[in-house]
């Protein structure tokens, strides 16, 4: 990636910037003209909190979230989201009034699995899928299928690089 094509975009959050690089980027399922680097958002606590605050604002008290399923190394942001959701008194169905933060195991065919110890964190739970970005939707579709297969309900899909997905069918 060329540094001269990179720049920062200030967001409405004081601790949050988008780091963007213009160019031509190829992925397995498509091409993109811009790369948004979310490494700092995923690793720096102040930025993770700012992202979490923005994402939590889309969920009101009628959205029940029991588990946050992390894709793309989003555990720090998920932890901040869970902290904000539980502090705000959001409902969940877990006996201890806490939110599970879970990362799936990826198998060779591109599917996600959960072992015996973690499958219980999906079964009968309302699961929010958290990812860094949505380009083609393939990975999020695989995650949604896994949640349904293990007996969970997809409560929503959140991404640090996608503001809102309208009319999504779970």
Where in the sequence are the language-model features?
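Long, contiguous hydrophobic alpha-helical segments, chiefly transmembrane helices and signal peptides
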Residues: 24, 34-36, 48-51, 77, ...
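Conserved PRPP/pyrophosphate-binding segment of the phosphoribosyltransferase/PRPP-pathway fold
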Residues: 41-119
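Active-site-facing substrate-recognition patch
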Residues: 1-64
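Nucleotide donor/acceptor-binding cores
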Residues: 29, 66, 124-126
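PRPP/pyrophosphate-binding module of the type I phosphoribosyltransferase fold
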Residues: 106-170
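Residue-level detector of short coil/turn "hinge" positions at structural boundaries
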Residues: 32, 92-95, 154
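Short glycine-rich loop/turn motifs that provide flexible caps or phosphate-binding loops at active sites
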Residues: 28, 69, 136
């Amino acid at each position: 990636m060329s540094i001269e094509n990179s720049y920062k975009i200030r967001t409405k959050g004081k601790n949050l910037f988008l780091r963007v690089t213009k160019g031509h980027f190829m992925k397995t399922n498509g091409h993109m003209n811009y790369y948004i680097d979310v490494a700092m958002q995923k690793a720096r606590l102040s930025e993770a909190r700012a992202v979490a605050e923005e994402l939590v604002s889309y969920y009101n008290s009628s959205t029940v979230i029991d588990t946050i399923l992390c894709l793309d190394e989003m555990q720090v942001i998920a932890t901040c989201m869970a902290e904000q959701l539980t502090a705000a008194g959001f409902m969940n169905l877990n006996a201890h009034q806490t939110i599970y933060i879970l990362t799936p195991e990826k198998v060779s065919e591109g599917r996600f699995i959960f072992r015996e110890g973690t499958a219980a964190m999906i079964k009968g739970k309302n699961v929010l899928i958290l990812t860094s970005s949505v380009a083609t939707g393939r990975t999020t579709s695989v995650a949604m299928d896994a949640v349904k297969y293990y007996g969970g309900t997809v409560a929503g899909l959140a991404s640090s690089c996608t503001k809102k997905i309208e009319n999504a069918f779970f």
